């Protein structure tokens, strides 16, 4: 690989978000064969991002196999495009949530309900959660630290999916208090990659709380709320996969991210 990287790149560019992309094509058959041999020695690969897209691709492939019972396994529908990274070269960032309203609750009742499962601390400035089991919340122009009660974390720790902080938030706040049953389809929730920062959460909450009236004044729509998450750990992700379970939607934000559309996998019969 180091020899190939000394050659002229097929593509070399910087995207609008400042991420540099360099692509080399390996066409030499001996090099390709050597890489295939090395990959055969890799004991396991894990889907770190795009779990639900991968599952959809598998379903499409299986349906095409049913439609073409004479398939031999070399057809393009037997494959889907992916990129592999060593786990040491991946960084998982927080994947945060913004909910556009409090589901008919006033802020005081909402805070009171949260205290059943969390210790709540007022913050003087925006910060990200430092440890697992903590969630930072932005509500009413103020930041709060939510620390899950020890007995709650202990009860959930035996299940690798329930032990995830994103599952904790969904099961204790988003679902029962804010009425977010399916975060994949509910239009009241937004997901914000941690690379955007905490100020982006404040901005979005403000956008959903206030609107410009016809006379130019600000009209209050109602309280919105944001949740800043502690990043999912690599070991947590691997543990879920090793138990043959599926990661919840929007549970990981990975860097680096390849620019979509650089490579296209065409599926033909």
Kindly label every feature range from the protein language model.
Residues 1-210, 218-269:
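Surface-exposed, charge/polar-rich loops and edge strands
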């Amino acid at each position: 690989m180091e020899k190939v990287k000394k050659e002229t790149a097929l593509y070399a560019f910087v995207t609008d978000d400042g991420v540099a992309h360099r692509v080399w094509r390996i066409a030499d058959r001996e090099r390709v064969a050597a890489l295939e041999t090395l990959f055969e020695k890799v004991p396991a690969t894990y889907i770190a991002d795009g779990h639900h897209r991968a599952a959809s691709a598998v379903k499409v492939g299986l349906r095409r196999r049913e439609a073409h019972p004479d398939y031999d396994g070399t057809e393009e529908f037997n494959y889907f495009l992916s990129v592999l990274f060593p786990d040491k070269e991946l960084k998982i960032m927080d994947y945060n949530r913004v909910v556009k309203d409090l589901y008919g609750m006033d802020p005081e009742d909402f805070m009171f309900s949260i205290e059943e499962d969390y210790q709540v601390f007022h913050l003087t400035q925006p910060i990200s959660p430092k440890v697992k089991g903590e969630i930072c919340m932005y509500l009413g122009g103020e930041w709060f630290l939510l620390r899950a009660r020890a007995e709650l974390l202990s009860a959930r720790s035996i299940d690798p999916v329930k032990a995830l902080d994103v599952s904790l938030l969904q099961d204790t706040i988003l679902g029962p208090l804010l009425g977010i049953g399916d975060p994949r389809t509910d239009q009241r929730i937004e997901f914000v990659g941690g690379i955007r920062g905490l100020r982006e959460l404040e901005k979005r909450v403000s956008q959903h709380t206030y609107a410009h009236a016809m006379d130019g004044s600000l009209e209050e729509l109602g309280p919105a709320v944001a949740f800043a998450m502690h990043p999912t750990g690599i070991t947590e992700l691997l543990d879920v996969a090793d138990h043959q379970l599926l990661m919840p939607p929007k549970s990981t934000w990975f860097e680096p991210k390849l620019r979509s559309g650089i490579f296209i996998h065409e599926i033909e019969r």
